[in-house]
Amino acid sequence: MIRIIFLGPPGSGKGTQAHLIANKYNIPNISTGTMLRQALTRSTHKSYELHKNIMHTGDLVNDEFMVQLISTRINQNDCRNGFLLDGFPRTILQAKSMKQCKIFVNYIIEFFASDSVIIDRIAGRRIHVGSGRTYHIKFNPPRNYGLDDITGEILTTRKDDHEEAIRKRLSNYYQHTEPVLDYYREESKYKKMKYFSVDGNRDISKIYKELINIISS
């Protein structure tokens, strides 16, 4: 059973690799960002509207909301043989709540990249909302401009993919999520999971090859 967490700042390459690895090992790719955007699009409840506004400014959605969302998803049947969590947990409380909920993983993989690379990547990013598939107009373009490779549906730009929100998200990541990396480095010393750091500044194919080697080792 393969249970993986991908952590890293937005634009570090983890989203692209999450789709590739999930397809390779036939496990669900659980992207918190995609799940939130889908949930917020479907709902008119006031609490969802609040979280929608939080996302668009680059702030973090509260821990209780996120843990409930992820716990519900992981308990679905398609996760029995494994899963890949893309971008969760984002805070120490979320990480500890996972442990309390008996959600355990085999691999923690940290992606890192420079801020300049991240901003360049995100500015050109295009998203297929229905699946969460991610493209880039320069580095990873779709076969047909502006259209998803699988469905042919129109790709969109996220509302929080502007520079001010990007910098806010990076600030939140360094403040809240980097301590999570320290937490998992310590946890990995007990040999219940493996922790790896991956250079996300490189080409997609090179990163993918390294990930396959890590998971196969």
Swiss-Prot record:
Keyword Secreted recorded = no
UniProtKB keywords: ATP-binding, Cytoplasm, Kinase, Nucleotide biosynthesis, Nucleotide-binding, Transferase
Residue numbers spanned by region LID: 124-161
NMP: region residues: 31-61
Enzyme Commission (EC) number: 2.7.4.3
Specify the pathway.
Purine metabolism; AMP biosynthesis via salvage pathway; AMP from ADP: step 1/1
GO biological-process terms attached to the record: AMP salvage
* Superkingdom of the organism of origin: Bacteria
Q: Where are the transmembrane segments?
A: none
- Please classify the protein's predominant subcellular localization into one broad category: cytoplasm
Q: Which GO terms describe its molecular function?
A: adenylate kinase activity; ATP binding
Q: Which residues bind AMP?
A: 32, 37, 59-61, 87-90, 94, 158, 169
- Extract the InterPro entries matched here: Adenyl_kin_sub (IPR006259), Adenylat/UMP-CMP_kin (IPR000850), Adenylat_kinase_CS (IPR033690), Adenylate_kinase_lid-dom (IPR007862), P-loop_NTPase (IPR027417)
Give the CDD domains listed for this entry: ADK (cd01428)
The cross-references to SUPFAM superfamilies, in alphabetical order and at most eight, read: P-loop containing nucleoside triphosphate hydrolases
Query: Enzyme class, one word?
Result: transferase
User: A Gene Ontology CC term for this entry?
Assistant: cytoplasm
Compartment(s) where it occurs, according to its Swiss-Prot or TrEMBL record: Cytoplasm
Q: Which reaction does it catalyse?
A: AMP + ATP = 2 ADP
Q: Which PANTHER family match?
A: NUCLEOTIDE KINASE
Q: How does it assemble?
A: Monomer.
| Biological role stated in the UniProt entry | Catalyzes the reversible transfer of the terminal phosphate group between ATP and AMP. Plays an important role in cellular energy homeostasis and in adenine nucleotide metabolism.
Name used for this protein in its record: Adenylate kinase
Q: Which organism is it from?
A: Blochmanniella pennsylvanica (strain BPEN)
Q: What is the lineage of its organism?
A: Bacteria, Pseudomonadati, Pseudomonadota, Gammaproteobacteria, Enterobacterales
Q: Which gene encodes it?
A: adk
